[in-house]
Curated annotation (Swiss-Prot):
Composition-biased stretches (Low complexity): 264-329
The protein, known as: Secreted 45 kDa protein
Encoding gene per record: usp45
UniProt xrefs under PANTHER family: MYOSIN-16-LIKE, MYOTONIC DYSTROPHY S/T KINASE-RELATED
Keyword field contains Signal: yes
Provenance organism: Lactococcus lactis subsp. cremoris (strain MG1363)
GO MF annotations in UniProt: protein serine/threonine kinase activity
Signal peptide from the UniProt entry: 1-27
Region (Disordered): 264-343
Length: 461
């Protein structure tokens, strides 16, 4: 019973050691999630800054668009004024041309007939004073009209000059406004380019943050799934442990009952047959003297199938004699470690969920019940199995047991437990493909190919 407890403790250590990497991976995942959360927070800050930049640039763009609209309105107004001025200038030019012709004609007439002569002729040739006054008045009127025409001519020429200056000034203003508009258009284009870059940076930041967040969620989901699977395996292990303990208790009770029956039968036989073999007398007397020895040959023959259910159990009879230990050879001519030792059904002596449990269940399905090997970690089957008569060494072949401490076979270096598995196939390149329990993502029935170097191949006796 002590050996069973020790075996359970050791196997629990193996299971917990196998589960430890899952806890480590989950912890690493949580650490990575915390780091990525910080990255996402930083990305959100960058998003706010980018949005502020977008708002600022958009404000500038709106201002430029307003200026552009105002400038276009001013240009349209200047063009309209220029058209009106051009029309007025054309009219003034026509009026000036007509007056110029009239003044030129009057000037030529004045050269031929001077004003003084006109006045003298008017006085001399007048018939009366009234006629004189009328002619002089007419001459004065003509002179006044010519004077007004000259003044109007000068005025209109001055207006023409002023309007020309105005048109020229407006034209210059139009050119200046056009240049300003072009400059503003270039600035607008530049600002829009900056706005586009800022927007793209913002989108890239958001996309990156979302990708990282999704990666984190996927990684976290995978870690949680692994943790759930580990919890399920632990629960299955505990259930198997409970079943194994119940089966072991039943097996121990049956063994004790069988030993008691065998002891009673041996006592009855001894009382009815006084004469026994010398070897039996010697064995019995040695057992009585030491109170701690191997079972006698007759008792061994009677109870070998019962006592083999647990090589580590100890049973004390009422007289204080002790039947104990693991028989690995011949005692009184009976081979306890020979063929058939694993043929009698027993409860699974190996802790559930591990590599030894997987191999035991593999052979139990074939009606072969491997006895408890102590110490019985996976790598120890290679030496302790044959030494205790439970296993024997064979060559590499499909369906045999593989046991080793090699790093490639175990899966990591310096293992204190080693590993045991079932050979699925033997490959030409010096490797073997194995099926195993307590290993890999599949955990139960996991398959992989490893080097056959340093591996011992076994079969149950």
């Amino acid at each position: 019973m002590k050996k069973k407890i020790i075996s359970a403790i050791l196997m629990s250590t193996v299971i917990l050691s196998a589960a430890a990497p899952l806890s480590g991976v989950y912890a690493d995942t949580n650490s990575d999630i915390a780091k990525q959360d910080a990255t996402i927070s930083s990305a959100q800050s960058a998003k706010a800054q980018a949005q502020a930049q977008v708002d600022s640039l958009q404000s500038k763009v709106d201002s430029l668009q307003q200026k552009q609209t105002s400038t276009k309105a001013q240009i349209a107004k200047i063009e309209s004024e220029a058209k009106a001025l051009n029309a007025q200038i054309a009219t003034l030019n026509e009026s000036i041309k007509e007056r110029t012709k009239t003044l030129e004609a009057q000037a030529r007439s004045a050269q031929v007939n001077s004003s003084a002569t006109n006045y003298m002729d008017a006085v001399v040739n007048s018939k009366s004073l009234t006629d004189v006054i009328q002619k002089v008045t007419a001459i004065a009127t003509v002179s006044s009209a010519n004077k007004q025409m000259l003044e109007q001519q000068e005025k209109e020429q001055k207006e023409l000059s002023q309007k020309s200056e105005t048109v020229k000034k407006n034209y210059n203003q139009f050119v200046s406004l056009s240049q300003s508009l072009d400059s503003q258009a270039q600035e607008l284009t530049s600002q829009q380019a900056e706005l586009k870059v800022a927007t793209l940076n913002y989108q890239a930041t958001i996309a990156t943050a979302q990708d990282k967040k999704q990666a984190l969620l996927d990684e976290k989901a995978a870690a949680e799934k692994a943790a759930q699977e580990a919890a399920k395996k632990q629960a299955a292990y505990e259930a198997q442990q409970k079943e194994a303990a119940q089966a072991q208790a039943a097996s121990t009770a049956a063994t004790a009952k069988a030993v008691e029956a065998a002891t009673s039968s041996a006592s009855a036989s001894s009382s009815q047959a006084p004469q026994v073999s010398t070897s039996t007398d010697n064995t019995t007397s040695n057992a009585s003297a030491s109170n701690s020895s191997n079972s006698s040959s007759n008792s061994s023959s009677s109870s070998s199938s019962s006592s083999s259910s647990s090589s580590s159990s100890s049973n004390s009879n009422a007289g204080g004699n002790t039947n104990s230990g693991t028989s690995t050879g011949n005692t009184g001519g009976t081979t306890t470690g020979g063929s058939g030792i694993n043929s009698s059904p027993i409860g699974n002596p190996y802790a559930g969920g591990g590599c030894t449990d997987y191999v035991w269940q593999y052979f139990a399905a074939q009606g072969i019940y491997i006895r408890n090997i102590m110490p019985g970690n996976g790598g120890q089957w290679a030496s302790n199995g044959p030494a205790q008569g439970v296993l024997h060494v064979v060559g590499a072949a499909p369906g045999v047991i593989a046991s080793s401490f090699s790093a490639d076979f175990v899966g990591y270096a310096n293992s204190p437990y080693g590993h045991v598995a079932i050979v699925k196939s033997v490959n030409s390149d010096g490797t073997i493909t194995i099926k195993e329990g307590g290993y890999g993502t599949t955990w139960w029935g996991h398959e992989r190919t490893v080097s056959a170097s340093g591996v011992t191949f076994l079969m149950p006796n």
